[in-house]
Amino acid sequence: MYVIVASLNDPVSRIFLDVIAPTPLVKTEGNIEIRKFVDFPVVVYRGEPTDFSREDILASFGKYAIFISRHEMANPRPLFTVHTPGSWPDVSISNPPLTSSIFRTLCKLAYEPYTCAFEATHHTPNTSYISATFVEVGSTENEWKDRKAVETLAQAVEEVLNSQIKPNTPAMAIGDLHYVTVTDPVLKGELDLGHVIPKYVDISLQVVQNAYLKHTTPIERAILFKKNVKNPARSEIIEFLKSRGVEIITKG
């Protein structure tokens, strides 16, 4: 059901593969190797995580993909991050229970100077029929090569995949910052967060509809940052969400 994606051009992925070794080779398809980590398939790709486009291969092994990747940011700091990928207005399928469970586990395992963050939906790939979750270590080369940090990431992923994930209220956020501010209810287990539409996106009804539809479980709650979503789009979005029975929590 779960499939891990590691990219050989990515330093965090390379260390991750070393940490979880041995990963016996199952088969090769072109420039892609299929390996095995305990009971989970590992797709090893000779490229960048954001360039992976063989969703068909992932779908042949599972429904929920976890991409191991480095994280970069303008003002770098030691950080563990999770998010759903998507290059707006198109996005991947988001898996709120899985992404939020990994986030909670990373936050539990994080050690100084590392902190944890839930990011808004951004960058490729865009999936159509399997969910995608990025799990990252950042934010400079020093952290990407930090074996202890990657071991912590691997521990978090393995812990979640070997657990019975308890679902909470599935939610999305509209108009939040890139580094999500509504993580307290996620950490408390009150909700599972899927797509987060950041305020720098041109937020329209179509963008919200696309994101709403691309979740593994129907969204029951939406957190709307009013000041970052202008009318008439805001009114259209509220009307759409209400028509789907979604509880709307407004902020700002």
UniProtKB/Swiss-Prot annotation:
First-level EC class: hydrolase
Entry's cofactor comment: Binds 2 Zn(2+) ions per subunit.
InterPro entries: Deacylase_DtdA_archaea, DtdA
Gene3D superfamilies per the UniProt record, alphabetical: AF0625-like
Reactions performed catalytically: a D-aminoacyl-tRNA + H2O = a tRNA + a D-alpha-amino acid + H(+); glycyl-tRNA(Ala) + H2O = tRNA(Ala) + glycine + H(+)
EC identifiers of the protein: 3.1.1.96
Cofactor: Zn(2+)
UniProt GO molecular function: D-aminoacyl-tRNA deacylase activity; zinc ion binding
Swiss-Prot/TrEMBL keywords: Hydrolase, Metal-binding, Zinc
GO biological process, one term: D-amino acid catabolic process
Subunit note: Monomer.
Role description: D-aminoacyl-tRNA deacylase with broad substrate specificity. By recycling D-aminoacyl-tRNA to D-amino acids and free tRNA molecules, this enzyme counteracts the toxicity associated with the formation of D-aminoacyl-tRNA entities in vivo.
Family: Belongs to the DtdA deacylase family.
Name the record gives this protein: D-aminoacyl-tRNA deacylase
